Amino acid sequence: IIFFYLFSFSYSQANFKEKLIDKLKTTNTLSFDFIQIIGKKKEIGNCHIKYPLFMKCEYPKKKKSIIANGKKFAIIKRRYKKIYYYPLKKTPLFYLLKKENILDLIQNYEPTVIDTHTIEYELVWNNSNKLKIFFDKDSLDFLGWKTTDAYSNEVSFFLKNIKVNITIENKIFTIPQIEDL
């Protein structure tokens, strides 16, 4: 009986990994609404991701956008007419927006948590940076992530109303000039 249980558990785990990998391989774009929590602050908005390395998120209440254009990551604050630039490779988003990183993580590592609703994987790099990625256990939909920002704040990002493989024009990932704000 114990052998059967262990065999069926490992088969089940291998089966969901295979399905998750297949689903990710066929995902080229994601559009979704989000809830972002940093400390006690909650923000809402919408995002578009186009693999590899493109992302745009709008925070309507804050009049703020973030854009990853493949090389740079920019935080655009329209209210203050400011743009802050960062090398994309130095941010946790680089690991999230490069689909091969996620596929490698799933193929080569076991989930850190599997509960009744969620599958969680954790990516650690440079011995201190962590990115936790969450998937729905039943649908295998991407649910969100958790990381730490440059100021050591925990950042949780939860997705809802997800649309997969819709057409997203590349021009939305253009970082504006400061005079255009």
Model-identified regions with their sequence ranges:
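A short, Trp-centered hydrophobic/proline-enriched beta-strand micro-motif
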Residues: 22-42
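Short, solvent-exposed coil/turn segments at beta-strand boundaries
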Residues: 26, 48-54, 68-72, 116, ...
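Flexible, surface-exposed loop/linker segments and immediately adjacent secondary-structure boundaries
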Residues: 79-119
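Hydrophobic h-region of N-terminal signal peptides that target proteins for export
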Residues: 3-12
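An acidic-aromatic
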Residues: 47-95, 155
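Gly/Pro-enriched, hydrophobic low-complexity segments
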Residues: 104-181
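Short hydrophobic/aromatic-rich beta-strand segments that constitute the beta-sheet cores
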Residues: 34, 55-59, 73-76, 121, ...
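Cleaved targeting-peptide boundary
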Residues: 11-22
